[in-house]
UniProtKB/Swiss-Prot annotation:
Name of the protein in question: Small ribosomal subunit protein eS4, Y isoform 2
Any single GO BP term: translation
Ranges where the S4 RNA-binding domain occurs: 42-104
GO molecular function: RNA binding; rRNA binding; structural constituent of ribosome
GO cellular component, one term: cytosolic small ribosomal subunit
Organism: Homo sapiens
Lineage: Eukaryota, Metazoa, Chordata, Craniata, Vertebrata
Keyword Amino-acid biosynthesis: no
Source domain of life: Eukaryota
Length: 263
């Protein structure tokens, strides 16, 4: 019987969205414990070495991190296996680049560059609202932040905008029909659309119906929905494709049209 924490991760057992090839080694970097789950995060070493190609080996990534060049959500991180997750802001001060981790429609984290202004805030989904000691209300977000004395109008499943400099809530978006959202889990991972309907199922999961910009409708559980803006206007910039999933035939037609226009 195994005792103690697991310290290794086989490459074939690593999450698919890390996009690691099977034949370049036996092991994959196991993410440290942190604000995001193992299957829903991207370790810094994978982001720097495999995505940005700023390093060739793990040792080079360690040397970059130990010089305090990398910040996640405004805080310096030196752990190369630190788990960055959905909507986190990764800043590299040496190059002046800022990235936000968001899903593309293939279900992988896109390398999405953002402006300096956008890197000053992030959105967080409200997971739980409780009352702590001495009657102090607490709000817990999807990235394990605990914020005291939130606005009484904020409810579970709403989205709060957090200033990364102060860590305080600057604004919030209600979970309501007509607001734009992104799917963060399940078969429709990475799709963006407007909430059209919410089916309530007491004792089970509520089902949310969403319509994307092309007019295609789909449904998913309420726990998979992350509201990202009021009305049709998202509060964060979206990666290429704007969260619209194309069918195989539509992708083929798009490729052919691009080839003909370039040729």
């Amino acid at each position: 019987m195994a005792r103690g924490p697991k310290k290794h991760l086989k490459r074939v057992a690593a999450p698919k969205h890390w996009m690691l090839d099977k034949l370049t080694g036996v092991f994959a970097p196991r993410p440290s414990t942190g604000p995001h789950k193992l299957r829903e995060c991207l370790p810094l070493i994978v982001f720097l070495r495999n995505r940005l190609k700023y390093a060739l080996t793990g040792d080079e990534v360690k040397k970059i991190c130990m010089q305090h060049f990398l910040k996640i959500d405004g805080k310096v991180r030196v752990d190369i296996t630190y788990p960055a997750g959905f909507i986190d802001v990764i800043s590299i001060e040496k190059t002046g680049e800022h990235f936000r981790l968001v899903y593309n429609t293939k279900g992988c984290f896109a390398v999405h560059r953002i402006t300096v202004e956008e890197a000053k805030y992030k959105l967080c989904k409200v997971r739980k609202i409780t009352v702590g000691t001495k009657g102090i209300p607490h709000l817990v977000t999807h990235d394990a932040r605990t914020i005291r004395y939130p606005d009484p109008l904020i409810k579970v499943n709403d989205t709060v905008q957090i200033d990364l400099g102060t860590g305080k809530i600057t604004s919030f978006i209600k979970f309501d029909t007509g607001n734009v959202c992104m799917v963060i889990a399940g078969a429709n991972l990475g799709r963006v659309g407007v909430i059209t309907n919410r089916e309530r199922h007491p004792g089970s999961c509520d089902v949310v119906h969403v319509k994307d910009a092309n007019g295609n409708s789909f449904a998913t559980r309420i726990s998979n929905i992350f509201v990202i803006g009021n009305g049709n206007k998202p509060w964060i910039s979206l990666p290429r494709g704007k969260g619209i999933r194309l069918t195989i035939a539509e992708e083929r037609d798009k490729r052919l049209a691009a080839k003909q226009s370039s040729g």
